[in-house]
């Protein structure tokens, strides 16, 4: 097995175990197993692992391996935003589960739960995975990967917006609150979305300055996240 594939498998196992640990914590906070929104969210995470193993690992093992590496040239602003994202995600899930257990929001219509499920599924299992399949340079923190001949990607979802992976993650965070039935969880969910918008703006700015061909690509694909809006 090539070293990159071995490293990619380790990364995928780590991510999958982390997701399973998160799922266990969710049900632990809620305090019961007969909670279908929790199982629906679990299915979204499990499906992501399956799709990553089936469609990303065979074509981009080096990209997955790269996501596990720490580089000295990682930007401090990016690491700070990643930390804020982690805190917001932890608050979002904890608040949602406490809300379900203690009944702060109260029952929501089934359509609200299903709408949240659709947003989370489209964002995480479709748009994010599609972005990773298309972009061999889709790594966890911003850096120009000169050692891998980093180049502009303009196919797939990148033909419509310049940062489709961030759009997918924003949809996931906004959808989770509705799926789990917690309006209180929308507060950290919107904070996570705001952090991703800031990260998009900063990353887009440095890509213009540092990645050859990106300015020409940005002139062709005008929208950073949402066509017709921004």
Model-flagged regions — what are they?
Residues 1-158, 167-230:
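Membrane-anchoring alpha-helices and their flanking helix-loop junctions
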Residues 161:
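Conserved SAM-binding loop
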